[in-house]
Design a protein with these regions (language model features):
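Juxtamembrane and boundary regions of transmembrane helices in multi-pass small-molecule transporters
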Residues: 66-72, 76, 88-91, 108-159, ...
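Alpha-helical transmembrane segments of multi-pass membrane proteins
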Residues: 29-41, 68-87, 119, 253-267, ...
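Hydrophobic alpha-helical transmembrane segments in multi-pass integral membrane proteins
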Residues: 89-94, 173-179, 225-244, 309, ...
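Hydrophobic alpha-helical transmembrane segments
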Residues: 30-38, 52, 75-76, 111-115, ...
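Small-residue-rich segments of transmembrane alpha-helices in multi-pass membrane proteins
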Residues: 30-34, 78-89, 147-155, 218-232, ...
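Membrane-embedded alpha-helical segments and adjacent helix-loop junctions characteristic
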Residues: 1-70, 217-290
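Re-entrant/interfacial helical elements at transmembrane boundaries that shape
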Residues: 18, 51-62, 75, 89-103, ...
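Long, contiguous bundles of hydrophobic transmembrane helices that form the permeation core
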Residues: 122-206
């Protein structure tokens, strides 16, 4: 999937998509704000949130210079929605990939469980960010309306028309294969390998460039992480932790869900959610077996907690760091205080919604 994303970026797909949507809303700031939030969430369902923010934030900065508005509110909203969108599917945020592959859940399982929670939460989050920033957005829209600007044509973003068409077809095929993999019997890993091979063949002489741009550090990190977690599992430490949660909750499933969800969210706000999720998987597995509760319920609580909790602080998720860095390069500093003032309440709201929806659906 990394190779596919690099191939799409190479031909200008992401910049074209952003510019196309901006043109559709006639470059008005408020509709643009809402559109980019929704776009961020949708793209993050299939593409890693770092890539989504890299391109969305860059285009946001470019449009802010044209339309004379402060890009910080839009970048913050995009970052949160990227993390939220990633929670909706198995191939979104890395914790979901780990949870899905370790516990045997499919793309459809995530889409019909965490995806429903993410979809409802997205509506609430859009309203939240609009209420928080509506005065600033309205002022920016009024200023933009008074200026005469020439806007770039979306087609200018396409660097290779033939490659653009091929990359779009490959992306659509990937989406179809991921959505239907439970029915076809194809594993997510097989689909990823197939898509990467097709992308490399389509890239031709640029195939080596795509291979060089793969994030090998992340891949090696995953390999090492699984080895460490396997070692912890063998020592029995994780079973002790599972028993501890079981003792605290006293076998009460409602309390178990709350503990897993909120501990995951709080921990992920300060530590990398990937190793945390990997560590928690055998814990919830042991907890499920010991307390005779449905493992999937605990898995959805873990997924939502780790995916959303990272949004609360600037260091909680990689997408946050990328968004802040992009804004800083353009001269817009986002300090801890400003970030947490906006993002922490949004995180609490979504984690609260997640808990209530899990209660309503499974208890």
């Amino acid at each position: 999937m990394m190779i596919m994303v690099e191939g799409m970026a190479r031909v200008g797909f992401f910049r074209w998509l952003c510019m196309r949507l901006a043109k559709m809303v006639k470059y008005k700031v408020v509709p643009l704000f809402v559109t980019f939030m929704v776009l961020s969430g949708i793209l993050a369902m299939f593409i890693d949130s770092i890539t989504v923010i890299l391109f969305l934030a860059a285009v946001t900065i470019e449009l802010s210079q044209l339309l004379k508005f402060n890009p910080v509110p839009m970048i913050l909203a995009e970052v949160f929605c990227a993390n939220l969108g990633g929670s909706a599917t198995m191939c979104g945020d890395p914790p979901n990939i780990i949870i899905g592959t370790s516990l045997g859940y499919s793309f459809t399982d995530f889409l019909t469980n965490t995806g429903v929670i993410a979809g409802i939460s997205l509506v609430v989050v859009v309203l939240y960010f609009y209420l928080v920033f509506h005065k600033e957005l309205r002022a920016s829209e009024a200023a933009a309306a008074g200026s005469n600007q020439t806007y770039p044509d979306p087609s200018e973003a396409i660097t290779d028309k033939k490659g653009f068409i091929i990359s779009t077809v490959i992306f659509l095929c990937a989406v179809v294969l991921l959505v239907t993999h439970a029915q076809t019997g194809l594993t997510v890993s097989c689909i990823g390998v197939f898509i990467s091979i097709v992308t490399l063949i389509a890239a031709g002489k640029d195939a080596l460039k795509l291979i060089r741009q793969i994030d090998y550090k992340t891949l090696l990190f995953f390999i090492g992480l699984f080895m460490v977690v396997g070692g912890l599992e063998q020592t029995g430490i994780l079973k002790v932790m599972a028993n501890f949660i079981g003792d605290i909750s006293n076998g009460n499933l409602m309390l178990m869900i709350a503990i897993i969800l909120w501990i995951s969210a709080i921990a992920s706000a300060f530590v990398d959610n990937i190793p945390f999720a990997a560590t928690m998987i055998p814990i919830i597995s042991s907890l499920s077996a010991a307390q005779s509760v449905d493992l999937s319920i605990l898995a959805w609580a873990l997924a939502m907690g780790t995916d959303i909790g990272g949004s609360a602080t600037p260091i909680g998720a990689s997408a946050n760091v990328v968004g802040i860095a992009t804004a800083a390069k353009a001269g817009h500093m986002i300090k801890w205080g400003k970030y947490c003032k906006v993002m922490a309440p949004a995180t609490i709201i979504v984690v609260g919604i997640s808990m209530l929806m899990i209660y309503a659906r499974y208890l």
